[in-house]
Amino acid sequence: FLEEAARELGLRNVDVRWGRAEDLAREPGLRDGFDLVTARAVAEMATLVELCLPFARPGAGALVAAKGPGPGDEVARAAAAIEALGGAAPKVVPVDSFSGDGQRFTAVVVQKASPTPNKYPRRAGLPNKRPLA
């Protein structure tokens, strides 16, 4: 789907990769390589930052995670994980649904302040089974 969407939209600077984030985050050019990393309906915030933040460029990159209308407790539980992975304090931004149905959700924005330690992400499956928070 993603390859076809990029082709239909005429996007040229798109590289679709298949694999687990735990493995891909160790590849040169992918780790610390992106200004923006997005995720929607993937996992709790503590797991999500371990899977996604290693891809963001330190000092310039960010993770933007789509969450439901009240992610405060989930974000608070992830505070230690965010710090351990090199993230700055998260910002929760209310967003209107693009579907026009009047639903609201939030975008949780985590700036990448410093490099993620090399021990993260942990091996496949561990971030979900044993979140850092």
Annotate each PLM feature.
Residues 1-133:
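S-adenosylmethionine
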